[in-house]
Amino acid sequence: MSLKQSMENKDIALIDILDVILDKGVAIKGDLIISIAGVDLVYLDLRVLISSVETLVQAKEGNHKPITSEQFDKQKEELMDATGQPSKWTNPLGS
């Protein structure tokens, strides 16, 4: 059985697709030109990068060894301690 046939009969959830996209990353580039009577009125150069923060950090460091969420959180805490800046994502109510 080919890969295509095996995938046709398999239910794939949206969360599975998002998991793969965030793990590997996706780059999308496109151009949008709006013109009337052959005159270009609007030109948009679109570039979108969808990835998790962990994937981007690994790519920037050139580190291909996987980093766990716990290691990433530890590095984030060390960086916040070094800079003296509190995390803007913490809940001020403490819950």
Curated annotation (Swiss-Prot):
Question: Which parts of the chain are coiled coil?
Answer: none
Primary localization class, coarse: other
Uses in industry and biotechnology: The minimal pNL29 gvp locus overexpressed in E.coli can be filled with Xe and used as a contrast agent for ultrasound and magnetic resonance imaging. Engineered gas vesicles (GV) can be used for noninvasive imaging in E.coli and mice. Heterologous GVs with 2 copies of gvpA plus gvpC from D.flosaquae and the gvpR-gvpU operon from this bacterium make GVs suitable for imaging of bacteria deep in mouse tissues (e.g. the gastrointestinal tract), or when expressed in tumor-homing bacteria, can be detected in tumors.
Q: Give yes or no: UniProt keyword Iron.
A: no
Keywords, sorted A to Z:
Gas vesicle
Task: List locations, semicolon-separated.
Answer: Gas vesicle
User: Which terms in the GO cellular component ontology are assigned?
Assistant: gas vesicle; vesicle membrane
Look up the domain of life of the source. Answer: Bacteria
Any GO MF annotation of the entry: structural molecule activity
Q: One Pfam family name from the record?
A: Gas_vesicle
- Read off the InterPro entries from this record: Gas-vesicle_GvpA-like (IPR000638), GvpA (IPR050530), GvpA-like_CS (IPR018493)
| Record flagged with keyword Transmembrane helix | no
Family according to the record: Belongs to the gas vesicle GvpA family.
Role description: Probably a minor component of the gas vesicle. It is not clear what function gas vesicles perform in soil bacteria. When a minimal gvp locus (gvpA2-gvpR-gvpN-gvpF-gvpG-gvpL-gvpS-gvpK-gvpJ-gvpT-gvpU, called pNL29) is expressed in E.coli gas vesicles are made.
Q: Name it.
A: Gas vesicle protein S
Query: Which organism was this protein described from?
Result: Priestia megaterium
Gene from which this protein is expressed = gvpS
